[in-house]
């Protein structure tokens, strides 16, 4: 399955060894993870500003993501579908890469449930689906 992992899931995977870390490892092995330059830049910026990572470590983490996962540069959406315009970048990446789902901890995105055939799920909903 082709999946976009939202920035908040990626950050949680890197800063703790919890659910999101396990989810990232699982998806890296079993699925095709798709990212975009916007998601990677947002990830790097959050590590430095919010979590006080040294820039060199944030660059290394971002480089690891770029080397391990597919990277797409989506065109902007024709119309905004999210309250937060940054969330439109997540949707655009998933639609451009023909992903089946977006995994996010963002409370606004799951309210949409699906956009252009892309399901939007929380990490716990993703695990429930995988346990199937």
Regions found by a protein language model. Give the residues of each.
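Acidic, PIN/NYN-like endoribonuclease modules and their adjacent C-terminal/linker elements
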Residues: 100-101, 107-132
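Short, well-structured N-terminal submotif of metal-dependent ribonuclease cores
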Residues: 1-35
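PIN-domain endoribonuclease scaffold, especially VapC-family toxins
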Residues: 26-78
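Active-site neighborhoods of divalent-metal-dependent phosphate/nucleic-acid chemistry enzymes
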Residues: 67-102, 107
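A short acidic, often aromatic-flanked loop/helix-cap motif at beta-alpha or helix-coil junctions
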Residues: 41-42, 77-82, 126-131
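Alpha-helix N-cap/helix-start and coil->helix boundary motif
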Residues: 17, 40-41, 109, 127
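Residues that scaffold the ATP/ADP-binding catalytic core of kinase and kinase-like folds
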Residues: 12-14, 46, 112, 129-130
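A secondary-structure boundary/capping signal
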Residues: 6-7, 35-36, 105-106, 122-123
């Amino acid at each position: 399955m082709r999946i976009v992992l939202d920035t908040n899931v990626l950050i949680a995977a890197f800063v703790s060894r919890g659910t999101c870390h396990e989810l990232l490892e699982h998806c890296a092995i079993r699925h095709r993870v798709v990212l975009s330059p916007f998601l990677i830049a947002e990830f790097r910026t959050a590590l430095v500003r919010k979590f006080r990572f040294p820039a060199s470590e944030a660059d290394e983490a971002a480089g690891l993501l770029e080397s391990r996962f597919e990277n797409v540069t989506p065109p902007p959406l024709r119309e905004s579908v999210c309250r937060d315009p940054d969330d439109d970048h997540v949707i655009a990446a998933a639609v451009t890469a023909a992903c089946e789902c977006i995994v996010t901890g963002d409370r606004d995105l799951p309210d949409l449930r699906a956009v252009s055939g892309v399901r939007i799920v929380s990490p716990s909903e993703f695990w429930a689906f995988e346990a199937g």
